[in-house]
Amino acid sequence: MSKVTVYSKPNCPQCTQTKKKLEQKGIAFEVIDISQDKNALQHVLDLGYRQAPAVVSGEKHWSGFRPDLLSAL
């Protein structure tokens, strides 16, 4: 399985739901706070996303809480 990175920010309900779903599935993931890391924020913007969370797993990536895509990991 590819490394999973969740680009998150504080007080983000969809971020919380995404992390909870990954934990329930037993999937290890890294959380990067885009409010504290400007390079990470730029990476998310470069991917074309304006909404948190942005999730990156290998070549796949998406934004928002997407249980359908999380279940496919």
Language model feature labels by segment:
Residues 5, 30-32:
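Conserved beta-strand positions in the Rossmann-like core of class I SAM-dependent methyltransferases
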Residues 67-73:
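Short hydrophobic/aromatic patches at helix-to-coil boundaries
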Residues 33-49:
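Thioredoxin-like thiol-disulfide oxidoreductase module
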Residues 1-25:
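Local sequence-structure signature of Cys/Sec-based thiol-disulfide redox active-site neighborhoods
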Residues 9, 49, 67:
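ATP/adenylate-binding site constellation spanning eukaryotic-like Ser/Thr protein kinases
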Residues 28, 50:
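Residue-level detector of anion-binding/catalytic polar loops
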Residues 53-63:
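A short, hydrophobic beta-strand/beta-hairpin element that forms part of a small beta-sheet core
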